[in-house]
Each structure stands twice: as C-alpha cells, then as structure tokens.
Amino acid sequence: MNFPDIEVVSAKVHEAWIASKLAQGVISRKSEVGEELMVEYDLLSEAAKDLDRNTVKAVYAAINQLV
C-alpha cells in the first residue's frame, strides 16, 4: 500500500497536536531535555520530530495489518 510521505504526515500530526494543546489552554510543552515542542515542525530537533514520525509509522503499520 502506498502511504503519503512520512514527513508530510508527521508535520500534520504535529500541527494537530499543537491545536489540541492550545484548545486545552496549554501554551508551552517541553521535552524531557527542555526543548520547546509547541513550535512549527520544521523548528523541532530530529529527536522531537521522531516522536511524530513514530506515531505515523505506528498508524501505517496498523493499517497494513488490516488490509
């Protein structure tokens, strides 16, 4: 099955995560090492981007198991 590019979807997942946090009144969220995570996807470290990438990869794997 051909899925959309992981980077493109990861950026969208990150946008949705930020929107969800903002809707809850959260304006800042930091990683375990103190990196601000509520910034544009392109501004994240590779380690922080991996959080979103891993989410997308897990969803893709789950879909593959269903088809």
Which residues are covered by each model-predicted region?
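Alpha-helical propensity feature that highlights long, continuous alpha-helices across diverse contexts
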Residues: 1-67
